C-alpha cells in the first residue's frame, strides 16, 4: 500500500446546513481492525480548528472518549465552541459515522495562545539508540491477516527499547516500550513545523507495552481505546518522534498506559494517557 497523507485524509469540509457541522471521508488506510482512534481524534480536532478560525490558537490539551466503533468512510463532526477568550478557547466535538449508527466519539479540547511564563522541564529523554541506529520494524508482526495493520504502512518505525513482541524466545520484563515513528508522508505545516494534530495517531499506539510484561506466550488480544488524553507541550521541525510508553496497570479486562513523545533533538513534545479495553480476538469460524 502506498503511504497515506494524514493531512489530506483527515481534512474536513464545512456544511452550510447548520453552524458547526463538518464532514470528512476517511479511507481504510488508517485502520487497525477499525480506524485508529487517534486518527479519528485528529479529524475532530481539524473541525475544531476550522470552527475557531484563529491561527494563533494552538492545541494545548484534548480528551477523547470513544463511545462506539466508527468505521472508515463518510463521517460527520458537530462542533460547539464553549468559550473563545483572549488567551484560550474551550471547544468540544462529536464525531460519528454517517453509515453506521452509534454515538462515535466525543472530544473536549483547549486551544491557547503562546504566552510569557516560566520554562522548566524535570525529565530527560531516555538514553536509547537514535532512529538511525535502532532496529527496523518494517515487517509483519505475526502470521495471518492481522500481521501488520494498514495503519503501520504509513510509518517508518524503529525499536528503541523492548522486544519484538510477535517473535518467540524472549523473556518478559517491565511493561515499557520505546519506538521511533516517522510518517512516510511528512506532516509539516506551511512554516515547517511538525503538525501537532499528527500527534494523536502516534499517541494511540500504547498496547504493545503491556505485552512486554506478559511475555511471548500471552493469549492474543486487541485493545480498543476507551479514552485518550494528549497534552501538547512544544513544537518541533523534526519528523522522527520517540514514544516512551509505560503500561502501569492491567486488571479486570482493562489497562492503563501513559506515553511521552520526544523528538530526535531531545525535546519533549507531548504527553498522553489512555484507558483501554482488553478483548480476545474473535474465534475463527
Language model feature labels by segment:
Residues 1-285:
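Terminal targeting signals and extreme-terminal segments of soluble enzymes
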Amino acid at each position: 500500500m502506498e503511504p497515506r497523507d494524514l493531512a489530506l485524509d483527515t481534512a474536513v469540509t464545512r456544511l452550510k446546513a447548520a453552524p458547526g457541522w463538518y464532514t470528512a471521508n476517511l479511507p481504510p488506510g488508517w485502520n487497525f481492525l477499525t480506524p485508529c482512534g487517534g486518527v479519528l481524534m485528529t479529524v475532530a480536532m481539524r473541525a475544531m480548528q476550522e470552527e475557531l478560525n484563529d491561527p494563533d490558537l494552538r492545541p494545548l490539551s484534548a480528551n477523547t472518549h470513544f463511545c462506539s466503533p466508527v468505521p472508515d468512510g463518510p463521517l460527520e463532526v458537530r462542533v460547539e465552541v464553549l468559550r473563545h477568550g483572549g488567551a484560550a478557547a474551550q471547544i468540544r466535538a462529536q464525531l460519528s459515522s454517517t453509515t453506521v449508527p452509534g454515538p462515535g466519539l466525543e472530544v473536549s479540547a483547549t486551544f491557547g495562545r503562546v504566552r510569557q511564563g516560566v520554562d522548566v522541564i524535570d525529565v530527560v529523554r531516555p538514553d536509547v539508540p537514535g532512529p538511525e541506529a535502532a532496529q527496523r520494524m518494517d515487517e509483519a508482526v505475526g502470521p495471518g491477516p492481522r500481521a501488520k495493520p494498514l495503519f503501520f504502512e504509513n510509518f517508518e518505525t524503529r525499536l528503541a527499547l523492548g522486544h519484538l513482541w510477535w517473535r518467540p524466545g524472549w523473556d518478559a520484563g517491565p511493561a515499557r516500550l520505546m519506538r521511533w515513528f516517522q510518517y512516510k508522508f511528512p506532516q509539516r505545516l506551511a512554516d515547517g513545523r511538525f503538525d501537532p494534530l499528527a500527534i494523536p495517531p502516534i499517541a494511540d499506539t500504547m498496547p504493545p507495552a503491556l505485552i512486554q510484561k506478559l511475555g511471548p506466550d500471552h493469549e492474543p488480544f486487541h485493545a480498543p481505546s476507551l479514552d485518550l488524553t494528549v497534552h501538547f507541550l512544544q513544537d518541533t521541525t523534526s519528523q522522527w518522534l520517540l514514544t516512551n510508553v509505560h503500561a502501569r496497570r492491567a486488571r479486570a479486562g482493562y489497562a492503563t498506559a501513559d506515553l511521552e513523545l520526544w523528538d530526535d533533538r531531545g525535546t519533549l513534545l507531548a504527553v498522553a494517557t489512555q484507558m483501554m479495553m482488553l478483548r480476545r480476538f474473535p474465534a475463527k469460524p
